[in-house]
From Swiss-Prot:
Induction: By stress conditions e.g. heat shock. The modification Phosphothreonine is found at T199. The keyword ATP-binding applies. GO terms for molecular function: ATP binding; ATP-dependent protein folding chaperone; unfolded protein binding. It comes from the Bacteria. It comes from Alcanivorax borkumensis (strain ATCC 700651 / DSM 11573 / NCIMB 13689 / SK2). Belongs to the heat shock protein 70 family. Pfam families: HSP70. InterPro entries: ATPase_NBD, Chaperone_DnaK, Heat_shock_70_CS, HSP70_C_sf, HSP70_peptide-bd_sf, Hsp_70_fam. Residues 626-641 have a biased composition (Acidic residues). Acts as a chaperone. HAMAP family: DnaK. This is Chaperone protein DnaK.
Amino acid sequence: MGKIIGIDLGTTNSCVAVLEGDKAKVIENAEGARTTPSIIAYTDDKETLVGQAAKRQAVTNPENTLYAVKRLIGRRFDDKVVQKDIKMVPYKITKADNGDAWVEVKGEKMAPPQISAQVLKKMKKTAEDYLGEAVTEAVITVPAYFNDSQRQATKDAGRIAGLDVKRIINEPTAAALAYGLDKKGGDRTIAVYDLGGGTFDISIIEIAEVDGEHQFEVLATNGDTFLGGEDFDLALINFLADQFKADSGIDLGGDPLAMQRLKEAAEKAKIELSSAEQTEVNLPYITADSTGPKHLVVKVTRAKLESLVGDLVTRSLEPCKTALADAGVKTADITDVILVGGQTRMPMVQKSVTEFFGKEPRKDVNPDEAVAMGAAIQGAVLSGDVTDVLLLDVTPLTLGIETMGGVMTPLIEKNTTIPTNASQVFSTADDNQTAVTVHVLQGERKQASQNKSLGQFNLEDIPPAPRGMPQIEVTFDIDANGILHVGAKDKATGKEQTIQIKASSGLSDEEIDQMVQDAEAHADEDKKFEELVQTRNQADHLVHATRKTLEEAGDKATDEEKEAITKAVDELEEAAKGSDKDDIEAKIKALSEVSAPLAEKMYAEQAQQAQGAAGAEGEQPQAGDDVVDAEFEEVDDDKKK
């Protein structure tokens, strides 16, 4: 059985880890980095770039460079947060036929899980290159406050990427695993404050030693799935754009290229201000008008940045209060505070967390890597490689159904340990009603319409009876991934219907299968493209070498030889401009055959000179550095060995 890898699929960056021995190891990608930007770009020559390569070209290709797509996953197009996002990003967010938020690139509509699958494929390949074996199973992390649709969509992304997702695990819980696995001595209650690129979570977790086993029990979780580093960046971008408008009278908002440069500069300035008190944003030739080019030069102090993002930091503290209350603990009961997510490197965030909890956060947890490491540990637990860990997570939001009068009736309260199930008996609202619609909801509001609709289904063929008489038992079952299965049963007839909740949004199995096939087709295309490039390079090398041989041969080549070789060279050059690999290979073979006699003649002549003339071997390199000489010297070197 292969390794189960752990993947932190982040809004801004992603990370992959695997358990080696008893330690989780973060795997470096092909570029040598331990994290990979969650950015995907589609170029004009139909190439798909993922990670650093996509980030590098974002300034010149903003409309086709997708970032922070995780904020759209499992969301409806009409959601307020999606409408806000449309104004923030240079790429096109569009409405899918089922009402979901999708993206459109070069006229093609794509679902967020499809985009995220590209990042997951890169993580999968990174792990495979390191392990030297195929990887098919993974544990993928999600924000603790993700709802059912978002969890299901993340699982779909894994499937499209060719991964069997063994478990969806909450990011703060994963970080707690990474932190607490090797800690000995007594029970502890920790707070994991996770402020990432696009989402915020707070989890209160109890770590206990029970019969020699590490037990991680989540007491409560809360958060905001639209609060993260991207919002901090946006606050600074808006400030810089406003400053530029005040100085030059030009609004950069309508210029995607300028805004992309501004985004990169803002992110860089934000990072610099975590260690410096002041930085300068300097963007020459940001735009131009009739008076000439314009340059953006703005000094930003740490104090200024803090004033711009103060409300965002404050926003993160409300869920902390709720989580503590739900867990039934006070700040004084918290043993350790763990910071996760790149945005927690900001001194203002650290200061606010310290003041809120009354203690300094731990510094021995890497905020960028802890989540992936925890996912790898959970993978090892599932594969049986780690046996002394028990993880008890919770469902972040209340689950229930809509009942008469548009009220939400809860069946499973938030912060219930999962897996779990609950059932309740309901009845009909009208006389002789023969069917009931079970409308499944997730959220904390009493009014059904104010909660997230996870989907609905009908239980039919109920025998006619006065209202209130039929006994309809509705059962909710949440699996260890936090994904809901719902059943309804008429107790009189025993008729039952069970479904795994698939929201009216979300991808159907057929759509996912099609996306898996598309991904596989793209993999074949990529392989063919790579082979074509290699063949072209081979052709280019042969053309160059043959021309040098002709040049060196001079009068030693007959006119017929020169004509035949030149014709074959021209034909190969022409073939290499096209995309027919077989044709290029045929022309390579033809040129090799027609030029071989001349190459052999030259080689024999040089060998004769080398043997006949005293000291000729020392002078030989001066004859030129063509391919024939190179081959001659290689043979000579081999002889010397």
